[in-house]
Amino acid sequence: SLEMIQKAIGPRDWTALYQQNPVSDDGDYFTRDMIQYFDPADLDYDRLRYYTAWDLAIGQRDRNDYSVGMTVGIDEYDNMFVVDLVRGRYDGFELVEKILDFYEQWRPGIVGIEKSHIEMAIGPFLQKRVAERRLHSAYFKDLKVGRRDKEARARAIQGRMQQGRVFVPEDAAWTSTLVAELLRFPNGVHDDQVD
């Protein structure tokens, strides 16, 4: 199957050969040697503290940006494991359901949502659906991006990656897309996962 081939050849060759999307070994901002991998079967998920962040975009057209939700687990040594990621183009109703489904799956301590006109637009519906789904323990926090550009916002994760403290799963369906976006940052068409 294609999943077996993807595991066998690795993310770099997979994106080049099967997705017609080659990526150089080293990017301008993130380099391939900064990307650490983990085997999800070997991770002790019970010892991690979970956090989720969302970069929102609304619209389903091909030219629209993606909405991205990412859940990370932090271990007792401050290592960060990207345990799950959802990326797609959704309307406002779908987006709210994705946010809440993701919360129910991982039960993060904090769900950060980028403060923007989109967050303000879906906020009342999100609150309504939280009540209807009885997810009262969910803690949502506005992520304020301020006036800093994407490169400035990415510096914290860049430093953590340089220290070898960020890990991505070696075989998740979304790993190759995430790695490709990291290596193209800040010059790629999409940077929603990095953001």
Residue ranges of predicted features:
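An active-site-proximal beta-strand-loop segment
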Residues: 54-67
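Mg2+-dependent endonuclease catalytic cores in nucleic-acid-processing enzymes, primarily RNase H-like
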Residues: 3-4, 20-25, 29, 68, ...
